[in-house]
A protein has these predicted regions:
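Short beta-strand-to-loop capping motifs
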Residues: 46, 116-120, 153-155
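Short acidic/glycine-enriched loop/turn segments that link adjacent beta-strands
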Residues: 38, 110, 144-147
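Conserved PLP-binding catalytic core of the aspartate aminotransferase-like
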Residues: 89, 99-133, 149
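Active-site pre-lysine segment of PLP-dependent enzymes
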Residues: 4-33
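PLP-dependent enzyme catalytic core of the Aspartate aminotransferase-like
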Residues: 129-133, 138, 142-170
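Walker B beta-strand of ABC/ABC-like P-loop ATPase nucleotide-binding domains
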Residues: 1
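PLP-dependent aminotransferase class I/II
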Residues: 23-100, 104-107
């Protein structure tokens, strides 16, 4: 099972592998690129025999009518989807470069967020400064990794505010 929750923001995906191998399944969600996190609506791409096996055990009412209507409307508006996706990609690139200018090491992202660590100081005080100013990012400190920040791509205004606050702290 390949989880492609962020595939719409990536340069490549694994959908074609489904045709090559009957045991490969790809799951997608409308939570990220379609902005429907609250609906918890997704889908599975697999060969027909795999789908048939899932249908044998699925609940008769596994999706409610509101979620189906929301998902149908979202999928039907590909212009909005493409505009939103392109905006996220542009803003992600701007965030990436802005963080690098402030001394961060930024891992190239294939999602709607970036992961960064600062080359000369810990991330925790930066995280606290952002939180104190009502800018919420995720602080992570995993064994074997430098502590770092996971920053979601927001609007241009949100990214400007985030970068300005970070600049005050570094």
């Amino acid at each position: 099972l390949v989880d492609e929750a962020y595939a719409d923001f990536a340069e490549f995906n694994c959908i074609d592998l489904v045709e090559e191998n009957p045991k490969i399944m790809v799951s997608r969600t409308l939570s990220k690129s379609y902005g429907l996190a609250g609906l918890r609506f997704g889908f599975l791409v697999a060969q027909p025999q795999m789908i048939a096996e899932f249908c044998k055990v699925k609940d008769s009412y596994n999706c409610d009518a509101i979620s189906i209507a929301g998902a149908t409307a979202a999928i039907g508006d590909q212009q909005w989807f493409n505009n939103n996706r392109n905006k996220v990609l542009e803003t992600r690139q701007r965030l990436h470069h802005g963080l690098e200018k402030l001394g961060f090491d930024v891992i190239p992202s294939q999602a709607n967020f970036v992961w960064c660590t600062h080359s000369s100081q810990p991330s925790k005080p930066i995280y606290e400064h952002l939180k104190d100013n009502r800018v919420l990012v995720r602080y992570m400190d995993y064994e074997g990794w430098s502590d770092g920040l996971r920053i979601s791509v927001g609007t241009d205004e949100q990214i400007d505010a985030c970068l300005s606050l970070i600049e005050m702290k570094v």
